[in-house]
Amino acid sequence: MTTVYTLVSWLAILGYWLLIAGVTLRILMKRRAVPSAMAWLLIIYILPLVGIIAYLAVGELHLGKRRAERARAMWPSTAKWLNDLKACKHIFAEENSSVAAPLFKLCERRQGIAGVKGNQLQLMTESDDVMQALIRDIQLARHNIEIVFYIWQPGGMADQVAESLMAAARRGIHCRLMLDSAGSVAFFRSPWPELMRNAGIEVVEALKVNLMRVFLRRMDLRQHRKMIMIDNYIAYTGSMNMVDPRYFKQDAGVGQWIDLMARMEGPIATAMGIIYSCDWEIETGKRILPPPPDVNIMPFEQASGHTIHTIASGPGFPEDLIHQALLTAAYSAREYLIMTTPYFVPSDDLLHAICTAAQRGVDVSIILPRKNDSMLVGWASRAFFTELLAAGVKIYQFEGGLLHTKSVLVDGELSLVGTVNLDMRSLWLNFEITLAIDDKGFGADLAAVQDDYISRSRLLDARLWLKRPLWHRVAERLFYFFSPLL
């Protein structure tokens, strides 16, 4: 009996170390950032079982076997669709401004199409205005409505949008609604899904959370896009979820969420439609390729229309493209660079690009919320402040609520707006979308919004920052070390 016990003990110890060695080798063999690899190895060696379980659950990008197969299967038809779209040469811009040209060339080579011209674009900063405009557009819809959101929170004006969507479905409009399972948990626990399905709306719970499959697919991989397409002609995207700020997270102690949305008319809606069709096929297996744009209803020609590129990220989409786009934008800046984000945990490359821009004389400003709904990210972001301030970057702490807008403005002409936070999760993991806009008029509108944010912010004083308590510095460095994992 003693011999058997000894043998089992030795086998258990051997298996334990083989497991650690195997996971270590897997981490080292994966092409990943050194800080991320080092953080994972430290966790595994300090808390082996916890670290191994955590790594197997969220350490690698697992879309899941079924979705991965769908993603591979959809790309031949998607590539053909994009190639056919090139025949509509009149919708593509032949040239860009000097500040936007490098980014637009990058997107064209990575995604296969040039920037789309001839669009009407409206910047919207008030949730009531967004929802009222959306309700009007839904009421006027003639053919189809496609919607995807990370969060749909019942209550307030969100319910009015739901009612208008159901009314559209009842009068024969083909309505599709895709919501993230984790972000919209309150919605899926409410009566709304059944009501919508009974009205004729196709409702899909994207990336459904299932703890029984935690090792088969990353549960923290989320559908973070916010997009609405109506009749393949009108489109919305931006940072706003389908929530009424007066009813959303009122007990979080951060105030109302402050967002920005863009409403578009024109052929750019088709480019956004192919992104939605890819997401829909990955989730449902059904193919819904959008029709080509109607050449007869372009609202503006090149002389007055906004030129836009859609940049999509997530498993199955061009790898690292949004990260590359942000780096390109930062290095293209010659006069000023303004960035707004609720969550700031940049990669080393992005941090270096921002600091380098400031050090070569570019006026660089970053606007962040003073109070954050994520304690971990809030502390981790503070760990970057010293380096940013030393480089000459201005850090504004917004005091008018939780600033949730994600935007970048370069030299007043190149704008980036969408769903991407400046953190690891948005840059490397989630399904995201960003609009790259080459237009001085839109740049002026975005600059006015950012100036309003700055007027409601407090500029961080570098001298006072250096006098912060020691325990603050310790907490910042602790969370900074784990920032590659956030």
UniProtKB/Swiss-Prot annotation:
Protein keywords: Cell inner membrane, Cell membrane, Lipid biosynthesis, Lipid metabolism, Membrane, Phospholipid biosynthesis, Phospholipid metabolism, Repeat, Transferase, Transmembrane, Transmembrane helix
GO biological process: cardiolipin biosynthetic process
Record field: catalytic activity: 2 a 1,2-diacyl-sn-glycero-3-phospho-(1'-sn-glycerol) = a cardiolipin + glycerol
Function text: Catalyzes the reversible phosphatidyl group transfer from one phosphatidylglycerol molecule to another to form cardiolipin (CL) (diphosphatidylglycerol) and glycerol.
Domain of life: Bacteria
PLD phosphodiesterase domain boundaries: 219-246, 399-426
GO (cellular component) term, any one: plasma membrane
InterPro entries per record: Cardiolipin_synthase, CL_synthase_A, CLS_N, PLD-like_dom, PLipase_D/transphosphatidylase
Record-annotated active site: H224, K226, D231, H404, K406, D411
Localization terms from the record: Cell inner membrane
TM region(s), chain numbering: 3-23, 38-58
Coiled coil segments of this chain: none
A molecular function (GO) term: cardiolipin synthase activity
Protein name: Cardiolipin synthase A
Family classification: Belongs to the phospholipase D family. Cardiolipin synthase subfamily. ClsA sub-subfamily.
Membrane topology according to the record: Multi-pass membrane protein
Class of this enzyme: transferase
Lineage: Bacteria, Pseudomonadati, Pseudomonadota, Gammaproteobacteria, Enterobacterales
EC annotation from Swiss-Prot or TrEMBL: 2.7.8.-
UniProt-listed NCBIfam families: bac_cardiolipin
